């Protein structure tokens, strides 16, 4: 295993650990999800470069586009949550169903 692969696995597990530890605020969960997606993007890019294929790099662009869409949807949900309830706590998400 290369050192880059080990670093991306470490970043991925740090993102998972951040989600498990910081379950109180919605913004911290969104940031940890972005960390997971960035580490996945980096590992797929390194894998495509090591495989010497340019076809796999288009999958990375699709992943990056979908992660930007996920971030914008999450931020819009957080803005709606903070405007209506003056809080970004995860416990207030259940109130949005009413």
From Swiss-Prot:
The keyword Iron-sulfur does not apply. GO terms for cellular component: mitochondrial membrane; NADH dehydrogenase complex. Keywords: Electron transport, Membrane, Mitochondrion, NAD, Respiratory chain, Translocase, Transmembrane, Transmembrane helix, Transport, Ubiquinone. It is a multi-pass membrane protein. InterPro entries: NADH_UbQ_OxRdtase_chain4L/K, NUOK/Mnh_C1-like. Its main location: mitochondrion. GO terms for molecular function: NADH dehydrogenase (ubiquinone) activity. It is found in: Mitochondrion membrane. It holds the Pfam family Oxidored_q2. Its EC number is 7.1.1.2. It catalyses: a ubiquinone + NADH + 5 H(+)(in) = a ubiquinol + NAD(+) + 4 H(+)(out). GO terms for biological process: ATP synthesis coupled electron transport. The chain crosses the membrane at residues 1-21, 29-49, 61-81. Belongs to the complex I subunit 4L family. Core subunit of the mitochondrial membrane respiratory chain NADH dehydrogenase (Complex I) that is believed to belong to the minimal assembly required for catalysis. Complex I functions in the transfer of electrons from NADH to the respiratory chain. The immediate electron acceptor for the enzyme is believed to be ubiquinone. This is NADH-ubiquinone oxidoreductase chain 4L.
């Amino acid at each position: 295993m290369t050192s880059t692969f080990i670093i991306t696995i470490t970043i991925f597990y740090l993102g998972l650990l951040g989600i498990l530890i910081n379950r109180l605020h919605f913004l911290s969960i969104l940031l940890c999800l972005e960390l997971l997606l960035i580490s996945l993007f980096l590992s797929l890019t390194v894998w495509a470069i090591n495989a010497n294929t340019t076809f796999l790099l288009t999958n990375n662009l699709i992943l990056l586009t979908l992660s930007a869409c996920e971030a914008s949807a999450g931020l819009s949900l957080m803005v709606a949550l903070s405007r209506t309830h003056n809080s970004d706590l995860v416990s207030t998400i259940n109130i949005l169903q009413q």
